[in-house]
Curated annotation (Swiss-Prot):
Location within or outside the cell: Cytoplasm
Domain of life, source organism: Bacteria
Protein's organism: Salmonella choleraesuis (strain SC-B67)
Name recorded for this polypeptide: Chaperone protein HtpG
Annotated region described as A, given as residue ranges: 1-336
């Protein structure tokens, strides 16, 4: 063969092949689904390119995929007449994996085969799944529109190298031949292959045909029998589609191995005409947080495939949604640039966003357990919503889940509707606290009075929470209030201070002034508080001041952070505060005030500028 060369696989391909062969073997029949799915994609791409260049059909516009086998040679062949590939595309698609982050993902894989199977499945194994059942794979392909002599041959045993060469191939498209491993003869059985095609490929619009051989007059006559329905699933009536068909179609378009959590199939007529089929996956893709992660819906216009990953139809906080939209209102020659500035696109995006939020609301209402699965996988992404989508903020807020003092668990199961339903008589605000961890939030001294009064507090410990709460200002007419900020509503919750206590506080006024003088401009103010029960002192910020958690976010992002000026609040009933107020020794007074402030700062920030001084003062207090 001309132009023959042997090349090495990209290292990620070798890792993937090894992991896949071992972890997916128990579900090995999926290789046929993957290869037929690829053939369907190749047909879609040809239809799209032929819109502007009909000559690409080369006189053969009947697109299909054909499956045949040779029992003597122990081979199974999947052939399509789709878009095909040239030599560069073969090397690019069959010798490398173009996803960024692949290497670190594969290196993180463990030895748990069930887990590995799910992870590799969502990764989208596609072509490489052939090696689960084959010890050698041969590919013959030619790109649509190329000359017959520009065909390409590719072959590999999946062990680190592959051979590529030039061949003559008269018909366009791709032909994949699997040389089956010993013990895989079930895939040479006509009934078995038919059943797999029916199971996995009924929803594909492309006809899938199987070879039929009949003896007539001493000769073998070959014909092709269509196995699948070959009608695009989303064009069918919902009442005729089984759940299994919806599940398999999801796996086809998402290249996932697990069933989706839920879906919504809708046909809209009127001002706009479109069909949408939207899925919520049950598992987050491994590269969800990768900047290069491709997301979006498959776009069809009047049943013609236009593009994958059309991100213009979903806001970023719903980037986990998979599915498709088939529009009658967009032009067939639509481009990503046209989509960006299209009124039709904006209207579709608005309608589809509302559809997804309604779907999630229904899931939360009908199946709390499934919704918890969704929340664990995608909750952090949904929390981007209040900042990104003000128009749907109330609907998004209903879908948020939090840990709270009501449940005494770190599980985020409490909805805002749950919280509001439990609000105490006279309570006007929704109280929350943000912290680095659930434990830090739960045990914060800011909660002491609220806990004593039986008032629920939402415990927020995800990094995104502080940023989210800057945009989420109210729910159901109730304002959100951080308990780490100075607020009159919290002070009002304290019991009425009796006359004797008021007199005692008057006595402490000189002490407060003394502390102010000592600390100077290191704090914004010093005051007595009734919001503490067990703790001697805390620091709080004014409502308009940057919070501690927000300052941490800025610092982590490498941005300059303005100095946070805290209000130093002292508990007049605490023995340490009383003892400090009574001391006449100025040096000791200074040490104890500094110690109280350090304690409060440490509880608030989790760090101190000078921890050694804090330790020295603590040691000194312990031995005094």
């Amino acid at each position: 063969m001309k132009g023959q060369e042997t090349r090495g696989f990209q290292s990620e391909v070798k890792q993937l092949l090894h992991l896949m062969i071992h972890s997916l073997y128990s579900n090995k029949e999926i290789f046929l689904r993957e290869l037929i799915s690829n053939a369907s994609d190749a047909a879609d791409k040809l239809r799209f390119r032929a819109l502007s260049n009909p000559d690409l059909y080369e006189g053969d516009g009947e697109l299909r995929v054909r499956v045949s086998f040779d029992k003597d040679k122990r081979t199974l062949t999947i052939a399509d007449n789709g878009v095909g590939m040239n030599r560069d595309e073969v090397i690019d698609h069959l010798g490398t994996i173009a996803k960024s982050g692949t290497k670190s993902f594969l290196e993180s894989m463990g030895s748990d085969q069930a887990k590995d199977s799910q992870l590799i499945g969502q990764f989208g194994v596609g072509f490489y799944s052939a090696f689960i059942v084959a010890d050698k794979v041969t590919v013959r392909t030619r790109a649509a529109g190329d000359k017959p002599e520009n065909g390409v041959f590719w072959e590999s045993a999946g062990e680190g190298e592959y051979t590529v060469a030039d061949i003559t191939k008269n018909d366009r498209g791709t032909e994949i031949t699997l040389h089956l491993r010993e013990g895989e003869d079930e895939f040479l059985d006509d009934w078995r292959v038919r059943s797999i095609i029916s199971k996995y490929s009924d929803h594909i619009a492309l006809p899938v045909e199987i070879e039929k051989r009949e003896e007539k007059d001493g000769e073998t006559v070959i014909s092709w029998e269509k196995i699948n329905k070959a009608q695009a699933l989303w064009t069918r009536n919902k009442s005729e589609i089984k759940d299994d068909e919806y599940n398999e179609f999801y796996k086809h378009i998402a290249h996932d191995f697990t069933d989706p959590l839920t879906w919504s199939h809708n046909r809209v007529e009127g001002k706009q005409e479109y069909t949408s089929l939207l899925y919520i996956p049950s598992q987050a893709p491994w590269d969800l947080w990768n900047r290069d992660h491709k997301h979006g819906l498959k776009l069809y216009v009047q049943r013609v495939f236009i593009m994958d990953d059309a991100e213009q139809f979903m806001p970023n906080y719903l980037r986990f949604v998979r599915g498709l939209i088939d529009s009658n209102d967009l032009p067939l020659n639509v481009s990503r640039e046209i989509l960006q500035d299209s009124t039709v696109t904006r209207n579709l995006r608005s309608a589809l966003t509302k559809r997804v939020l309604q779907m999630l609301e229904k899931l939360a209402k009908d199946d709390a357990e499934k919704y918890q699965t969704f929340w664990k996988q995608f909750g952090l992404v949904l929390k981007e919503g209040p900042a990104e989508d003000h128009a749907n903020q109330e609907a998004i807020a209903k879908l948020l889940r939090f840990a709270s003092t009501h449940t005494d668990s770190s599980a985020q199961t409490v909805s805002l509707e749950d919280y509001v339903s439990r609000m105490k008589e006279g309570q006007e605000k929704i109280y929350y606290i943000t912290a680095d961890s659930y434990a830090a939030a739960k045990n914060s001294p800011h909660l002491e009075l609220l806990r004593k009064k039986g008032i629920e507090v939402l415990l927020l410990s995800d990094r995104i929470d502080e940023w989210m709460m800057n945009y989420l200002t109210e729910f159901d007419g109730k304002a959100f209030q951080s308990v780490a900020k100075a607020d009159e509503s919290i002070e009002k919750l304290a019991d009425e201070v009796d006359e004797n206590a008021k007199e005692a506080e008057k006595v402490l006024e000189p002490f407060v002034e003394r502390v102010k003088t000592l600390l100077g401009d290191r704090v914004k103010d010093v005051r007595l508080t009734h919001r503490l029960t067990d703790t001697p002192a805390i620091v709080t910020t004014d409502a308009d001041e940057m919070s501690t958690q927000m300052a941490k976010l800025f610092a982590a992002a490498g941005q300059s952070v303005p100095e946070v000026k805290y209000i130093f609040e002292l508990n007049p009933d605490h023995v340490l505060v009383k003892r400090t107020a009574d001391t006449k020794d100025e040096a000791q007074f200074k040490e104890w005030v500094e110690l109280l402030l350090d304690q409060a700062l440490f509880a608030e920030r989790g760090t101190l500028e000078d921890p050694n001084q804090f330790i020295r003062r603590m040691n000194q207090l312990l031995v005094s």
